[in-house]
Amino acid sequence: MGDYKLAKEAFVSGNPGASIWSINAVSLVALATYALWIALSPYIRHGLLNNYLICVLPLLLGVTIFSTSPLVFASFLSIISLFFIAKSQKRFNFPRSPEKPKGQWLDESDSDEEPAEPASAAGSAAVSPAKLLPSQVAFASGSLLSTDPTISPMSPSSSSSSGHEDPLGIMGVNRRRSPLEGVSLDVPSHIDSKVRISPVPSLRLKKSRATKVQGVEEKGRLPFLTVYRAHMMLMTVICILAVDFEVFPRWQGKCEDFGTSLMDVGVGSFVFSLGLVSTKSLSPPPPPPTPTSPALNSHIIPLTPSPLSFILISLRKSVPVLVLGFIRLIMVKGSDYPEHVTEYGVHWNFFFTLALVPVLAVGVRPLTQWLRWSVLGVIISLLHQLCLTYYLQPIIFSFGRSGIFLANKEGFSSLPGYLSIFLIGLSIGDHVLRLSLPPRRERVVSETIEEHEQSHFERKKLDLIMELIGYSLGWWALLGGWIWAGGEVSRRLANAPYVFWVAAYNTTFLLGYLLLTHIIPSSISSQTSPSILVPRLLDAMNKNGLAVFLAANLLTGLVNVSMETMYAPAWLSMGVLMLYSLAVSCVGWVLKGRSIKI
């Protein structure tokens, strides 16, 4: 066992990495996989097996067998997607004869004369519903769509029964008969109180759709954001075990000192994603209300907690992740498990980083009164880079590990870099959060509430696309300039170019998922609800990311102590990886099915 441990540690050490563009090419498989799901979703059952075969298995194949030709594999998946998208357009967009709804404006071919007044109310019941003029439609809409029909200002019956007297007698017997009396108003039942009322005739009356705004799930969740985070989790889960097999290319494993690889960007992406969804919880608290009387200012009791109390609250929330870190530490040290010390240190692991980064973000939050999250992240990264260049870098690359700080020098020294990534993720999250905010309640006469929300969402989505394009170009330009000036990327140090690379990578692929949901043909999006745009398996992994990540770590350890992974043939390696990924998928699936969220 001792010889195998040394061989295994040598197996995962000394990796020079690969080019950034080859890593982007491998990651394109994730976008192609999501496009495949969108194309196939109208034709399949959304059970666990189909979710796994479409959402997980292509990713596994993309980072292992097809990692040497990722563009070919992504193109193959894209061709299948385009075929089914074209098929869906023919299936759902067949021509239909236009059907004129009842109670709408008259066409030019219809008569402009008012309907004849029936002799009696009894006779009117047998008459077929009459077509209405524009003024009559506006009158009917105002009376039927009122939230309280008993107080309609234009309804004679409501006035007589309202309890108010009519001293002038204008609402009594001598009133002018309404042209709508005796006419059967067959107004469609779908018009309800959600339609906005206007004192002027509406230009058009549209059916109020019962479905949610396309592209927005319940509780403001966004499909593209859910899929992005779930795919990031999936690729991390796959790689942490696949790296132990020969079928996983060495250049995709973590680099030793400097370099770029798929697993290097995956670590930073995990932190970036955590910041992306922490925007609400880390937004600056609103200022306490100030009394209108200046005399009361001296008696104000501050209701806003102090920064220290916020830090303690955040630390308390991080306790479960810290506990997981200590559990992993005990298991690794107690089982003589092969470990790569230069990743984080002797005792440090990634759970400690995940637990401490949000606490540090709360500590620097008061600075957001003057600086944006992204600017603050860049400043911290540049200051960290200065410390690395002139003091810390020689110490980190040395062999000395005496004392608790030197033993875990990689973990401690990389915290400012991961904090910068987290803050940049918060900045992008601010922009994404605006997409789920409801529109202002404005007076609209030509569209329903649902249509108004849909148009608002589309405008905000286009704004977000343009913002992400700008941020992506900016981060890539910053990274390119730094590398051109001679800088090198180092995950071990979490230096400034590594921060810029993680920001550029994640902003670009978040933009890719958003574009996929934006360019979906209307024929598919009309038949595919927002809940179907997010595969159930990916939604389950997104909701229970911590449980899925913990299960993946436990299963990875179980596989490594059960077999000599580095000597396994390709067919056995792929079989184990498929069973492993299916087992992890089942964990998230079962938790979601039982409505358990960890």
Curated annotation (Swiss-Prot):
Glycans are attached at residue 560. Residues 152-162 have a biased composition (Low complexity). Residues 107-116 have a biased composition (Acidic residues). The chain crosses the membrane at residues 20-40, 43-63, 65-85, 223-243, 258-278, 307-327, 344-364, 377-397, 464-484, 500-520, 571-591. InterPro entries: PIGW/GWT1. Keywords: Acyltransferase, Endoplasmic reticulum, Glycoprotein, GPI-anchor biosynthesis, Membrane, Transferase, Transmembrane, Transmembrane helix. Residues 95-121, 149-172 are annotated as: Disordered. It is an enzyme of class 2 (transferase). GO terms for cellular component: endoplasmic reticulum membrane. It is found in: Endoplasmic reticulum membrane. It holds the Pfam family GWT1. GO terms for biological process: GPI anchor biosynthetic process; protein localization to plasma membrane. The keyword ATP-binding does not apply. Its EC number is 2.3.-.-. The keyword Methyltransferase does not apply. GO terms for molecular function: glucosaminyl-phosphatidylinositol O-acyltransferase activity. Pathway: Glycolipid biosynthesis; glycosylphosphatidylinositol-anchor biosynthesis. It is a multi-pass membrane protein. Belongs to the PIGW family. Probable acetyltransferase, which acetylates the inositol ring of phosphatidylinositol during biosynthesis of GPI-anchor. This is GPI-anchored wall transfer protein 1.
